């Protein structure tokens, strides 16, 4: 199938559609887009200015600046217990989102299947389709905190299955995989000879004394894992567009070819700033301050949603919460439209994240505390007036 045909199979993100509608309305509180409301820490901006003054305005290596790859290797070893060679097992990208299409294109053949636990981030399935593969949804359930269960994976694996995508902490559910979960997933991947793409962009935003574990740190897993991460969420740098992957050298080699004829290279002065940021304690202090504030907001939204009659699992990570709206009698799309038009609150229908997301909506609490309070008041008022809970 030609790429043009594959593009016809991919639909625009439901999240973006909602965002575009909300942007044309007045007095809307958007709890839709998953973006930190914090500004990039000032010292990171200063590093970027420093790089510009140094003349770092030219092309860099396709694989990324050596200084940044070395800083990433240090971070992976210290924080994730992953040993990766910065010269051939780490690559810098123009945003972490690039990793899915580029990574899948490194090994996936036409018609091969990729298991995607759902509800899932909206970019996964389109990336599989554009790479020539077939996305296979594997449902996760509220009763298990939306954590992936290997017993479910066993129901969907076939001879055509080539890879598995995992996301912990998870967008949209906020679930966090336990070490035991990852060990079972790793055994499953080895048994079926699968490549694992592990999306860990929310790793620093975890709560209730939960710990983050990287599947690539487990014995025998680095050689079959593409670890995806970035700077957008960690340091509130979404507009800077910078991500990275750690993977076996044969995968990195192919991804570099993709980047060579696509973006060429990530922005040079931004890479300089990111390398400095990773080694600056002020950056990690800022991350912890953001985490604490997200936690405060999480507790507020979780409490209010349950009080207004929308049963909600308490998320352990990221900055999303996934309330159940089935008892209202509305579909997730109908519920989202009602909240946008009547309450002027933008939330994302769970159906945007796969079949398992129907009956839920995603709320981002990466929004000022006072706005969240107002949004909860508005939502509760509409639910009471319409007698939906």
Swiss-Prot record:
Reaction(s) the record says it catalyses: L-aspartate + 2-oxoglutarate = oxaloacetate + L-glutamate
Positions of transmembrane segments: none
Domain of life: Archaea
GO cellular component, one term: cytoplasm
Entry binding sites for L-aspartate: 34, 171, 362
One annotated GO biological process: amino acid metabolic process
Sites bearing N6-(pyridoxal phosphate)lysine, chain numbering: 233
Keywords, comma-separated and alphabetical: Aminotransferase, Cytoplasm, Pyridoxal phosphate, Transferase
Cofactor(s) for this UniProt protein: pyridoxal 5'-phosphate
InterPro entries xrefs: Aminotransferase_I/II_large, AspAT/PAT-like, NHTrfase_class1_PyrdxlP-BS, PyrdxlP-dep_Trfase, PyrdxlP-dep_Trfase_major, PyrdxlP-dep_Trfase_small
Any GO MF annotation of the entry: pyridoxal phosphate binding
Record note on quaternary structure: Homodimer.
Family: Belongs to the class-I pyridoxal-phosphate-dependent aminotransferase family.
Name the UniProt record assigns to this protein: Aspartate aminotransferase
């Amino acid at each position: 199938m030609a790429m043009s045909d594959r593009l016809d199979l991919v639909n625009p993100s439901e999240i973006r559609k909602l965002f575009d509608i909300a942007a044309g309305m007045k007095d809307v509180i958007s709890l839709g887009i998953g973006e930190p409301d914090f500004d990039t820490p000032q010292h990171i901006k200063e590093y970027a200015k420093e790089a510009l003054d140094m003349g770092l305005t030219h092309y860099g290596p396709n694989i990324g600046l050596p200084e940044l790859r070395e800083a990433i290797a240090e971070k992976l070893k210290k924080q994730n217990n992953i040993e990766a060679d910065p010269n051939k097992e780490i690559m810098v990208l123009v945003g972490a989102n690039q990793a899915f299409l580029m990574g899948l294109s490194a090994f996936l053949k036409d018609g091969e299947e990729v298991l995607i636990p759902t509800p899932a981030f909206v970019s996964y399935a389109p990336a599989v389709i554009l790479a020539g593969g077939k996305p296979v949804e594997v449902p996760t359930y509220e009763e298990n905190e939306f954590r992936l269960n290997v017993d479910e994976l066993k129901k969907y694996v076939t001879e055509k299955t080539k890879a598995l995508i995992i996301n912990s902490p998870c967008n949209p559910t906020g679930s966090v995989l336990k070490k035991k979960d990852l060990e079972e997933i790793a055994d499953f991947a080895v048994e079926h000879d699968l490549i694992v793409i592990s999306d860990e962009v929310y790793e620093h935003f975890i709560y209730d004394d939960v710990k983050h574990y990287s599947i690539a740190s487990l014995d025998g897993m680095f050689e079959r894992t593409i670890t995806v991460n970035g700077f957008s969420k960690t340091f509130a740098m979404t507009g800077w567009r910078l991500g990275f992957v750690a993977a076996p050298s044969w995968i990195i080699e192919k991804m570099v070819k993709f980047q060579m004829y696509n973006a060429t290279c990530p922005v040079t002065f931004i890479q300089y700033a990111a390398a400095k940021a990773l080694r600056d304690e002020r950056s990690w202090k800022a991350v912890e301050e953001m985490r604490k504030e997200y936690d405060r907001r999480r507790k507020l939204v979780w409490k209010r949603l349950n009080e207004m009659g929308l049963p909600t699992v308490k998320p352990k990570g990221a900055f999303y919460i996934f309330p159940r709206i089935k008892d209202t009698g509305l579909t997730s799309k109908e519920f989202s439209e009602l909240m946008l038009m009547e309450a002027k609150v933008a939330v994302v229908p769970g159906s945007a994240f796969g079949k398992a997301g129907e009956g839920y909506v995603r709320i981002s609490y990466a929004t000022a505390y006072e706005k969240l309070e107002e949004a909860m008041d508005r939502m509760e008022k509409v639910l009471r007036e319409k007698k939906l809970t």
